[in-house]
Amino acid sequence: MGKILGIDLGTTNSCMAVIEGGKPTVIPNAEGGRTTPSVVGFSKKGDKLVGQVAKRQMIANPGNSVSSIKRHIGEGDYKVNLSGKDYTPQEVSAMILRKLKDDAEAYLGETITQTVITVPAYFNDSQRQATKDAGQIAGLEVLRIINEPTAASLAYGLDKEEGDHKILVYDLGGGTFDVSILELGDGVFEVLSTSGNTHLGGDDFDQRITEFLVEEFKKAEGIDLSNDKAALQRLNDAAEKAKIELSGVASTNVNLPFITADSNGQPKHIDIDITRAQFEKMTEDLVAKTLESMKMALSDAKLTTKDIDRVLLIGGSTRTPAVYNLVKNFIGKDPYKNINPDEAVAVGAAIQAGVLSGEVHDVLLLDVTPLTMGIETLGGVATPLIERNTTIPVKKSQIFSTAADSQPSVEIHILQGERGIASANKTLGRFVLDGIPPAPRGLPQIEVTFDIDSNGILHVNAKDLGTGKEQSISIQKPGGLSDEEIERMVKDAELHAEEDKARKEEVETRNNADSLVNAAENTLKEAGDVATNEQKEQIEAAIADLKTALEGEDLEAIKSKTEALQESVYKVSAAMYEKAQKEASAGAEASEDASGPSSTGSASDDDVVDADYEVVDEDK
């Protein structure tokens, strides 16, 4: 069995790790970074860019770049236009996953086909399925989807086998937030509860700074930058840097020269100071939202802050002092610092991958479903079948009946959420069980079964116990993709892979041809009388042919003209080398003649005489 890659597919950055020698190891990307920006873009030439190179071009080419796509995964109608083509969040995420896969293969020297991917604990069914679809599009078999806080606890608790620990994992990433409470003991990791917000993260903190800068600039210059894409991208980058700097210093300066120009063409600049106090004031409501989730998680787990043994902070945004202090003051304990908040989730994913591959032993992960799942019943009521924070995998059944006499069919409306009214919850899917024999209302027995697998993905079955007729569905919700769509996207991804390969081949072919032209021209200059006039003319003609080919788009013509020039140059280069050897040999013989007589005949071993010698000091 090959390596199984553990992937933290993050909103802002992604990270990957594998088990090597029984221990999790973070794999650097092709650029040498231990995390990869979750950014995708296309250059002005149409080349696909992923990671750091895509992030670098966002300021100059914001219309052909996308970041934080994770915030939209699972949204069925959402698409982003890049280089004139619409892409779903799954396709964009697949590009990021594909880069991670390719970089891991280059680092490990072996093919990677399987993965464990992490998601926020509060991701719903459609978001989980969409993440799994993204992996499939990227050419990866997703063996398991696990929750990010759970993965972080695996990273923390791998070597802590003695005694029971109750830990609170506070995960504030780039675009999502959740908090989970787990119990660790004897290699068993059991999730007791989870709560959170899939649309709250570091991006929102950055946005508050961006809005502040836009407003301050408008006051000073009377110019609104909110509709200037290029300026906004520069502001967003500056806001992120300011947020990071304010984690370590009391104030920072945002200086952006030539941010725009006024109506007279006069350039305008931004030069604004931001204090940590200002930043904390503009983001205090965001921090407060996370407190409510912590309270809910504790309540669901039937615990108090005194029951928590350890606090783990995950995600780069937890470095913000206001966040750190909130958690510390609420729980009454200093958060555990011996864990890298940017890498812990990927390390945990690698550990779970190691469990699946048999490389890691004596670890059992008991995760939970974050939201209640049920169906709509008479009167628009949401009837739960599986309550939130139920350990998964889980399978539960309940008997329902018809609402009207002689009702021939029933619609199963599948819901996810905590509201008692069906319309207030999220619809995961619908299907119809028909063929019910005529009978008075309440008499037919319809058994509805909910089955949540180890990835947290739901499968529903409805069966008429009287006739044995049944209907089932693996939820293909608004954010999910059909098998046909996934297959099309896989082929599309493969097509792009071929395009990328072809583009790379073209660049290398042209570079080789250019280098050869330069080398051939130098050879002509240095050849002198070694090359005949005919050979020189042949090389000059071959150079001209190759230059003409390089001006066109025919790659095969470039290759053939390159080969022709190589052949012409080779003959002259060989003659030049032979001449150089002769000159070197003649020089060596002249040197020997000058130093004394030498034997002109060949000597056999019998003619060789071993001589004693004595060193003579001529100064004596």
From Swiss-Prot:
Segments for region (Disordered): 579-620
Q: Does the keyword NADP apply?
A: no
Q: Please give the coiled-coil regions recorded for this protein.
A: none
Keyword entries, A-Z: ATP-binding, Chaperone, Nucleotide-binding
In terms of PROSITE patterns, this protein maps to: HSP70_1, HSP70_2
Xref: InterPro entries: ATPase_NBD (IPR043129), Chaperone_DnaK (IPR012725), Heat_shock_70_CS (IPR018181), HSP70_C_sf (IPR029048), HSP70_peptide-bd_sf (IPR029047), Hsp_70_fam (IPR013126)
Extent of Acidic residues compositional bias? 604-620
* Protein's job: Acts as a chaperone.
HAMAP family, alphabetized: DnaK
Q: PANTHER family of this UniProt entry?
A: HEAT SHOCK PROTEIN 70KDA (PTHR19375)
Q: What is this protein called?
A: Chaperone protein DnaK
Lineage, highest ranks first: Archaea, Methanobacteriati, Methanobacteriota, Stenosarchaea group, Methanomicrobia
